């Protein structure tokens, strides 16, 4: 098979487990990798690697479509989404599909359409994956040079990076267009308990949007996770989309500078490690977002955040005892602090009791009762609306606590229910995946650096014990 470049020249970049230099075939003898090493067998077979990636995309999209339809089939409109263990429908509802005031589901047909579209797309991707894995050319360099590449070709690699950045930027703008022109998105802060609305007054001020990045990650600061209005979220996507698209064009048109050529390792395994590191960071950030943010992840669909459930409990009992005649402004608790209300370290009026630690919670059902100095006593006495009482009672009993056996609630609660918040699942899964992706990043970065330096520590695959054992079949 004709190749356009010397294999010997580039092969040291990948850490192969034996010295074989032939690229034909996908078995251990010809690639140095056994079948279980997966795509490592395809390092120099760009056509087959394309097939593996397209097929993988097909599996992902198939899961999305099938799980989407599964959730639609099991969905009970009378119960909140977070009580039904749903993780996909809340995302569709947040985008404004099928929901009305208060987050009430009015139409499940858009969810059905989403599932079917993903299934159809997965069939197309699956066919493409099978075609390129089994029938298409092994390498793309000869027949389709635009799609071919050599891992060490720095200019080609940054061009591919640029194309990816442009696609990410277009993805960010899809959300912007949905929010501005195509029906709007769900705003949990809309008056009266949330509604779908078009975003009309985008925040584009760089001082506001990039100010989030400069905030402390702790307490009431909360870094970017503290964003609490949709104008900022959609405006942020305008900025990010623009930066990604402009950066993509830049990377397509330019070649890497000398310092970048020297500083970075230029091999397939190095790019894998960079990607895993980025995905790890995304996973950890997503974990914090779904844990604490009730604007991007509205509580109507995902259930309350931990602080929100705690504050809801204090609010619920304040309402109850006030009706029973308690003077909530002056009643003392067992420690001598206020039983229902007290002051924060900075002087605001906040809920008393154990929930004082969550005093900087902001939630749409609570904010109308605040004044310039925290909770307003006169509003608490006169202005509490029935929807606020209903919502806080609901959130109080649905804290995002839970265990692997799906018995939710506080660990010491004897009346525990079979409920685990989607917030718990999404936060935990993204934390665990973020951690494992970070380990993968370290592993592949170490191998890529070792290969670039011309040495590798590891098992000699030519004399591995398993090679002398009888095959399983």
Swiss-Prot record:
The keyword Membrane applies. Its main location: plastid. GO terms for biological process: photosynthetic electron transport in photosystem II. It is a multi-pass membrane protein. The modification Phosphothreonine is found at residue 15. It comes from the Eukaryota. InterPro entries: PS_antenna-like (IPR000932), PS_II_antenna-like_sf (IPR036001), PSII_PsbC (IPR005869), PSII_PsbC_sf (IPR044900). It holds the Pfam family PSII. NCBIfam families: psbC. One of the components of the core complex of photosystem II (PSII). It binds chlorophyll and helps catalyze the primary light-induced photochemical processes of PSII. PSII is a light-driven water:plastoquinone oxidoreductase, using light energy to abstract electrons from H(2)O, generating O(2) and a proton gradient subsequently used for ATP formation. This is Photosystem II CP43 reaction center protein. It comes from Jasminum nudiflorum (Winter jasmine). The gene is psbC.
């Amino acid at each position: 098979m004709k190749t356009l470049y010397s294999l010997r020249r580039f092969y040291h970049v990948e850490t192969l487990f034996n010295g074989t230099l032939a690229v034909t075939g996908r078995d251990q003898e010809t690639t140095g990798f056994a079948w279980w090493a997966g795509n490592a067998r395809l390092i120099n077979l760009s056509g087959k690697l394309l097939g593996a990636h397209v097929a993988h995309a097909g599996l992902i999209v198939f899961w999305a479509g099938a799980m989407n339809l599964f959730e639609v089939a099991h969905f009970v409109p009378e119960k909140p989404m977070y009580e039904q263990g749903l993780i996909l429908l809340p995302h569709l509802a947040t985008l404004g599909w099928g929901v009305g005031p208060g987050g009430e589901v009015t139409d499940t047909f858009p969810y059905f359409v989403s599932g079917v579209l993903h299934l159809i797309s997965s069939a197309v991707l699956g066919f493409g994956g099978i075609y390129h894995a089994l029938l298409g050319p092994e390498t793309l360099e000869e027949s389709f040079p635009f799609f071919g590449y050599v891992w060490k070709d720095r200019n080609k690699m940054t061009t591919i990076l640029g194309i990816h950045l442009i696609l990410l930027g277009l993805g960010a703008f899809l959300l912007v267009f949905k929010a501005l022109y195509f029906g709007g998105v769900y705003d949990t802060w809309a008056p009266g308990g949330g509604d779908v609305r078009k975003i009309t007054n985008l925040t584009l001020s760089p001082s506001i949007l990039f100010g989030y990045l400069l905030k402390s990650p702790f307490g009431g600061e909360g870094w970017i996770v503290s964003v609490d209005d949709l104008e900022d979220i959609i405006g942020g996507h305008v900025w990010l989309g623009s930066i990604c698209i402009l950066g993509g064009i830049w990377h397509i048109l330019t070649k890497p500078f000398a310092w970048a050529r020297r500083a970075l390792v230029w091999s397939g395994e190095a790019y894998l490690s960079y990607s895993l590191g980025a995905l790890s960071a995304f996973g950890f950030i997503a974990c914090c977002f779904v844990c604490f943010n009730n604007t991007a992840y509205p509580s109507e669909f995902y259930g309350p955040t931990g602080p929100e459930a705690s504050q809801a409990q204090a609010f619920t009992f304040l309402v109850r005892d006030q009706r029973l005649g308690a003077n909530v402004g002056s009643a003392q608790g067992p420690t001598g602090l206020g039983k229902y209300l007290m002051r924060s370290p900075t002087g605001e009026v906040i809920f008393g009791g154990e929930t004082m630690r969550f005093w900087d919670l902001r939630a749409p059902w609570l904010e109308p009762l605040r004044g310039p100095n925290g909770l307003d006593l006169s509003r608490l006495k006169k202005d509490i609306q029935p929807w606020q009482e209903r919502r806080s009672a609901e959130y109080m009993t649905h804290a995002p606590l839970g265990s692997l056996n799906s018995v939710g609630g506080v660990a010491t609660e004897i009346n525990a229910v079979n409920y685990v918040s989607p917030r718990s699942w999404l936060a935990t899964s993204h934390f665990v995946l973020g951690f494992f992706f970070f380990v993968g990043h370290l592993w592949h970065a170490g191998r890529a650096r070792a290969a670039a330096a011309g040495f590798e520590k590891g098992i000699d695959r030519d004399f591995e014990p398993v090679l002398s054992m009888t095959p399983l079949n």
